[in-house]
Swiss-Prot record:
It is found in: Cell membrane. Odorant receptor. The gene is OR56B4. It comes from Homo sapiens (Human). Disulfide bonds join 103-195. This is Olfactory receptor 56B4. Keywords: Cell membrane, Disulfide bond, G-protein coupled receptor, Membrane, Olfaction, Receptor, Sensory transduction, Transducer, Transmembrane, Transmembrane helix. Residues 53-60, 127-145, 224-243, 299-319 are cytoplasmic.
């Protein structure tokens, strides 16, 4: 038997690849899940590409809020594409093997895209806060330069701070098991196979979650709390409705972003049903990219009209 796939306990060995076993407990029929997952992936690609093209095509959408939405669409495509091709290869062709470098690269990409997405949500929250609470200063503060600098900072911050995750994982010694009960290379799933101490890895993972995603989400919800307080003080029902409509689309995106991962992190059913946290982890990386564009189309009037014009369903985006 190939030493790379057999389970041994010789500490002198160093495995050369991991085996992604797929969804725990349902290996025999997990290929049936490939159909809905493929549809979600195609929806994520098509809908987010439609957002990007629409924003580029319609001059009325050349505003900071829509530029941020376009960047979010790019990140969503990257996040979904990081995991879905390999998952479908496992389900369709039983291609479970993945080299250590490719696995560590996937760990980095998942963490990087996820943290960048969190930062983009923070930028969108700041944009709405200034637009609603400081409307007179909005044109001078939220400019194209502001969007460029903010997104540049977010990408640089998250790109650099997530580098230690795969580096620390690569420094571990993998000498015994190489079978991962997962469809993707999750950091905690990989380092759990290491033969040496992984305390530093777990600590950095926890710190990254709190410092980046935790602080971003705290600021996001604080911003929307202030926005809600300001909106409730408006005398005009029309202005209140418009403000709430704009913010609700953003909040829907954020709930997609945070909802499933909260369930995945808490994984209350992990001991009884290991499938649940693994499946939720997969869904977290494909459902938000697929549903984010739908939430935007339903709640953002200008974007919806832009879709109609681009697809030949409408004549004038300004109507």
């Amino acid at each position: 038997m190939d030493t790379s796939t057999s389970v041994t306990y010789d500490s002198s060995l160093q495995i050369s690849q991991f085996i992604l076993m797929g969804l725990p407990g349902i290996h025999e029929w997990q290929h049936w899940l490939s159909l809905p997952l493929t549809l979600l992936y195609l929806l994520a690609l098509g809908a987010n590409l439609l957002i990007i093209i629409t924003i580029q095509h319609e001059t009325v959408l050349h505003e900071p809020m829509y530029h941020l939405l376009g960047i979010l669409a790019v990140v969503d495509i990257g996040l979904a594409t990081t995991i879905m091709p390999k998952i479908l290869a496992i389900f369709w062709f039983d291609a479970k093997a993945i080299s250590l470098p490719m696995c560590f690269a996937q760990i980095y990409a998942i963490h990087c895209f996820f943290c960048i997405e969190s930062g983009i949500f923070l930028c969108m929250a700041v944009d709405r806060y200034i637009a609603i609470c400081r409307p007179l200063q909005y044109p001078s503060i939220v400019t194209k330069a502001f969007v460029f600098k903010a997104t540049g900072f977010i990408m640089l911050r998250n790109g650099l701070l997530t580098i230690p995750v795969p580096i620390l994982a690569a420094q571990r010694h993998y000498c015994s098991r190489n079978e991962i009960e997962h469809c993707l290379c999750s950091n905690l799933g990989v380092i759990s196979l290491a033969c040496d101490d992984i305390t530093v890895n777990k600590f950095y993972q926890l710190m990254l979650a709190w410092v980046l995603v935790g602080s971003d989400m705290a600021l996001v919800f604080s911003s929307y709390a202030v926005i809600l307080h300001s909106v409730l003080r408006l005398n005009s029902a029309e202005a209140m409705s418009k403000a709430l409509s704009t913010c609700s689309s953003h909040l829907i995106l954020i709930l997609f972003h945070t909802g499933i991962i909260v369930l995945s992190v808490t994984h209350l059913a992990e001991k009884k049903i290991p499938l649940i946290p693994v499946f939720l982890n997969v869904l977290h990386n494909v459902i938000p990219p697929a549903l984010n564009p739908l939430a935007c189309a339903l709640r953002m009037h200008k974007l919806r009209l832009g879709f109609q014009r681009l697809l030949g369903l409408g004549q004038d985006v300004s109507k």
